[in-house]
């Protein structure tokens, strides 16, 4: 697993992510390893009203189990197959949300399942907006200890903590 970090947003941006929680839980289902993913994102308009589109990707081997957003907006589902590709089952789920004034907040959450771990190779740290706080959690049970995480391109500002609970 590779984890990448991207830069570009600043705390002066109008829309910021005040908190993001992104968890990945390794499990076995009928003897096959899968990864359950839950992502919860809180947004805030810091200067004026603005539109935003929280989104997540899914497809044949990554199911979208639930999507929700506070503050209005209905989930939309679209195919994102690139041109000149014979077959690609890539899809996106997104919300069209509007924060109507400074200080307005909203939240979005997505639940996905990676049914084939060949498609669980990267976790991106960056988001579309400046991130005030983000926590990634990976839970790997002892029965799946053959899976390992590899951090790549971490800046000194990123803190990585590993722990083993009583279950191993």
Each language-model region and where it sits:
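Beta-strand-rich, non-transmembrane domain signature
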Residues: 7-168
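Sec-dependent N-terminal signal peptides
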Residues: 1-3
């Amino acid at each position: 697993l590779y984890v990448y970090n991207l830069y570009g947003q600043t705390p002066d941006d109008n829309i910021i992510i005040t908190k993001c929680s992104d968890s990945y839980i390794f499990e076995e289902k009928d003897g096959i390893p899968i990864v359950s993913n839950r992502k919860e994102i809180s947004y805030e308009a810091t200067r004026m009203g603005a539109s935003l589109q929280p989104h997540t990707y899914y497809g044949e081997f990554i199911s979208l189990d639930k999507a929700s957003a506070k503050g209005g907006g209905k989930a939309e589902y679209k195919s994102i197959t690139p041109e000149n590709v014979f077959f690609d089952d890539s899809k996106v789920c997104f919300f069209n949300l509007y924060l109507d004034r400074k200080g307005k907040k909203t939240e979005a959450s997505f639940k996905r399942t990676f049914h084939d771990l060949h498609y669980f190779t990267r976790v991106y740290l960056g988001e579309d907006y400046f991130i005030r706080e983000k926590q990634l959690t990976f839970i790997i049970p002892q029965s799946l200890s053959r899976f390992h995480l590899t951090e790549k391109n971490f800046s000194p500002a990123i803190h990585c903590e590993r722990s083993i609970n009583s279950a191993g």
